[in-house]
Amino acid sequence: MPDAGMLEDFLAGACVDAAVFALRPDYRALLLAVDGLVPGPGDQDSDALLHAAETAARQALDGGPTEQVPHVAAWREAYRAFGAKPQRTRNSLEALLRRAASGLPRVNRLTDVYNAVSVLHQIPLGGEDLSRYSGAPRLVRAAGTEPFDTAADGIAVIEHPDPGEVVWCDDAGVTCRRWNWRQARRTQLREDTTAALFILDALDPVTDQELHAAAEDLAARLARLGPGVRTVRRMMAADPAPGERG
């Protein structure tokens, strides 16, 4: 199990490339590195949380189209900025909101908790197995040659991002394509995950306060998943111009 210093060192190496901030200067990433998690199937608490998220999603949509939710609309604009088609590749928040009407997926209590927090706070949120990382996480615009470990028709395949696509990666390859669309198989959460990385993505109109509130909620809920859970967090944002962001 990593100690708190190792978690801090891991996050200290994380970075967002200047080319990404040039694309969206309003982008912020809040990273949580967590260990001491006790794996387990979904339970009454995680199911109740998902039900609350489903209710919140229906209230947020209020019968209207998902793409009119302000943060979803902002992410659709960001996807178009690097050449993706948001009607074909949806950000993770939009994908969950669209599923909420018929019921959010029940996977395991760790995945269920972070999916519910994503919907409740309307913020894209990814979770990955920290122990399977090779080096620190980096958000970059892809060269197009980086390997991406995924599956097609149930068969493991290696794909590559489009040149200029915004991707999360580590030293071994892409960990998430199109900012927050699809995660790699290599680093995905597993039934035996005890250390995890969570990435919360924000664009305007989401405020820093709202982003931190989502992280606080997630951290509090994760703390219930084991007697020795430890969490370290780091916020990454573009350097504000004088007079901006306080």
Predicted regions and their residues:
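Charge-biased, low-complexity intrinsically disordered regions
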Residues: P2-G246
